[in-house]
């Protein structure tokens, strides 16, 4: 699918990777999970991102995952492949492999983690990746995980590259507003923060790359529809009920909470791979009560004063 198909996507789900108890990928679980997403307003799917536990996946496993999901999706929604690493050469080799593999509207490349490059180093990293193949690139800017932040000024330099088509922005709403105001017209801006989706869409973002859409896609769609129809009272009411659910989804290192909920719902999401571990049983029960049932008492116990463990 093309850029134009991607431009129509408001809710892009950052898909989990289902695992067996022995840690191998559970390919048999994928069809039911995909159909669930598509039935609940997922417009596009990101594979091999943070929520997929990509640091624990080999490139060969990622390619197997890509093939399995493409077979199920069968062109119904655009797909994005996670292609970035903190090694520019490895990223180039993999983006070329994914481009040859085919079937993706874009590749998502994360800001290099651990190395702590300068702004010029980050600029050259993404420019070199974007120069390497015809696969359009979306930058993933998430300083809470990678320590360094790609500034809006550097992002706008990269936005002029013809093969860099957008950003998944996980910094501040102020940065997002600045980017939306100054970006090239066709440059796509997604928030990667479910809790900020309401504000981002009102600022003029193109959509959200989401974890919560695994479990709460219907209310996200309803909120976005209300925003599009200028029914801000309705949209804000949905957001007020949505925020505690998002907080619960990130009250333990992600994707452990969303996997606990999906397992509860009858899907074979399975465990996380080490070094991530499942949420403790009592915490998982509270998370499920918040996200699935909207239980106020569980909300207070689960999210009051919680600091996101990935930030």
From Swiss-Prot:
What is the enzyme's class at the highest EC level?
Answer: lyase
Q: Which UniProt keywords apply?
A: Amino-acid biosynthesis, Cytoplasm, Diaminopimelate biosynthesis, Lyase, Lysine biosynthesis, Schiff base
Which Gene Ontology terms describe the biological processes this protein takes part in? Answer: diaminopimelate biosynthetic process; lysine biosynthetic process via diaminopimelate
- Kindly list the GO molecular function terms attached to this UniProt entry: 4-hydroxy-tetrahydrodipicolinate synthase activity
State where the protein is found.
Answer: Cytoplasm
Q: One GO term of the cellular component aspect?
A: cytosol
Chief place where the protein resides? cytoplasm
- Determine the domain of life of the protein's source: Bacteria
The positions flagged as active site in the entry are: 140 (proton donor/acceptor), 168 (schiff-base intermediate with substrate)
**Which InterPro entries does UniProt cross-reference here?**
Aldolase_TIM, DapA, DapA-like, Schiff_base-form_aldolases_AS
Concerning its family, UniProt says: Belongs to the DapA family.
Protein's name according to its UniProt entry: 4-hydroxy-tetrahydrodipicolinate synthase
Encoding gene per record: dapA
